[in-house]
């Protein structure tokens, strides 16, 4: 991970912050996530890689008027899950294909080293995707 990620986001957005933040981290990093969210922006939490709990700066949350949504498949039925997946495919695949969205790749492992890749992921030592090559 890059300790200066918040500074990088603010630099890229000319200090305005992002309209939408897809948050895989939460936990102890949530206040940093709010700091890079545009005023009246939205944070959608889809993971808790930095912890399931943490302190929240409610003043920052209120002052920035951030809309926060938590997302989990654990409480959805199969039809809801299928609908979400289909909508994500329609929105994300074209954006990925056109280069509008780029996914950071942390590491590429040969398939026969999948245990090492899994260990890295389990230890939360990556920033971005871990790819297995065939």
What are the residue ranges of the model-derived segments?
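Short acidic-hydrophobic, aromatic-tinged amphipathic segments that line or gate anion-handling sites
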Residues: 1-4, 108-113
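Adenosine-nucleotide cofactor-binding segment
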Residues: 1-29, 81-83
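Alpha-helical elements of Rossmann-like donor-binding domains used by nucleotide-donor carbohydrate transfer enzymes
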Residues: 8, 20, 32, 87, ...
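Conserved functional loop/turn residues at catalytic and ligand-binding sites
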Residues: 13, 17, 25, 60, ...
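C-terminal capping/lid region of NAD(P)-dependent oxidoreductase domains
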Residues: 15, 98-107, 115-134
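Glycine- and other small-residue-rich loops at beta-strand/loop junctions that grip anionic moieties
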Residues: 19-23, 46-47, 106-107
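Glycine-rich phosphate-binding loop and adjacent beta-alpha segment
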Residues: 28-100, 133-134
């Amino acid at each position: 991970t890059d300790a200066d990620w918040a500074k990088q986001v603010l630099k890229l957005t000319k200090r305005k912050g992002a309209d939408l933040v897809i948050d895989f981290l939460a936990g102890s990093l949530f206040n940093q996530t709010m700091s890079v969210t545009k005023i009246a922006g939205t944070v959608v939490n889809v993971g808790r890689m930095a912890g399931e709990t943490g302190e929240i700066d409610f003043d920052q949350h209120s002052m920035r008027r951030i809309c926060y949504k938590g997302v989990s498949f654990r409480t959805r039925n199969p039809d809801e899950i299928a609908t979400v997946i289909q909508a994500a495919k329609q929105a994300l695949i074209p954006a990925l294909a056109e280069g509008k969205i780029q996914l950071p790749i942390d590491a590429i492992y040969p398939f026969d080293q999948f245990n090492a890749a899994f260990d890295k992921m389990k230890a939360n030592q990556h920033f971005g995707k871990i790819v297995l090559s065939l």
